[in-house]
Amino acid sequence: NRSTVFENRKAESFYMPREQRLTITARDHIKIAVCASLIEEKTEPQVLREDHVVLKLLGEQPYQRETSFIIDQNSNAKHLTVGEAYVTEGNWAGFPPHKHDTDNMPKECIAEEIYYFLFDPKQGFAVQCLYTADGSIDEAYRVKNDELVEFPYGYHTTVATPGYQTYFLWL
């Protein structure tokens, strides 16, 4: 339903449960993100159209981002949440830094996160910070177009560079 992620902020998706097959035939160039998690329950396939996607503004300036929730607790997918974030040029996302390595609902849940980045124009970049309270991890990465970052644990936050639209698919 869109030629680039920057064209329409409501992606359509398809949930395919375990032990099933799916064939995709495209009429033109297509880029697909395959997102998965472990699940033992049997669930049904589900088409998730634009009207299922929830758009939310998260944070406040200068750390605000527009986020779309594509696959969430209202889908047949269990143990999987997928969304997209659009970060305003020069803004922070996920600030103040947060983490997902302690079971303390509703403030925090245990979850690994992966971000897939795209920029417009493509030579753009973001800075991804990752650290732990004890200092065992304390890193900042320059993330470029078409790159992934994984957060198995620890605090993380992202800053978008001025002059570039920053997008990341998150799960």
Describe the predicted segments one by one:
Residues 1, 84-88, 107-134, 142, ...:
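Short, conserved beta-strand element in jelly-roll/cupin
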Residues 2-20, 48-51, 65-67:
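Short acidic (Asp/Glu) patches
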Residues 7, 135-136:
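Short alpha-helix capping/helix-loop boundary micro-motifs
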Residues 7-27, 37, 142-163:
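Conserved metal-binding segment of the jelly-roll/cupin
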Residues 29-89:
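Surface-exposed beta-loop interaction hotspot
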Residues 43-48, 69, 80-83, 92-100, ...:
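A short secondary-structure junction signal
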Residues 161-171:
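Non-heme Fe(II)/2-oxoglutarate
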